[in-house]
């Protein structure tokens, strides 16, 4: 009996260690709007809020809430990643215009990608992965995905849910153990 319990305990511990080392999201690379790249592997162990954005949309004022989240939680580990996209025909013509618009109107300092396909055309691999593994595709601009510290999808929200909504803040705080 002692041997059975010991065997069970060792197996259980090994499974726990394997589970703890599992990271669900593959690494993705995004082009940085300022040049260079972002690699999501650099953010392992941190929650990442990924939001497809647009400069000429009724939801564009949500940039303010995204920046507030960045300002409040970045030092605790949260990454807020803005992913400008013209897939819904509401983005500026080029990355320089997007960056200028966001800086002038919203004083954006959070990480921002170059203009990226999220639903149509050459869809970015992150969004392909979300569609394939979680049956999720942005329905409109300012759709949000929260990736947890272990690469797990903690939640998805549409455009109507503001970044500062408790629906988003609660899982962010939980993932930061606040």
Name what the model sees in each region:
Residues 46, 53-56, 84-87:
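Short pre-active-site segment immediately N-terminal to redox-active cysteine/selenocysteine motifs
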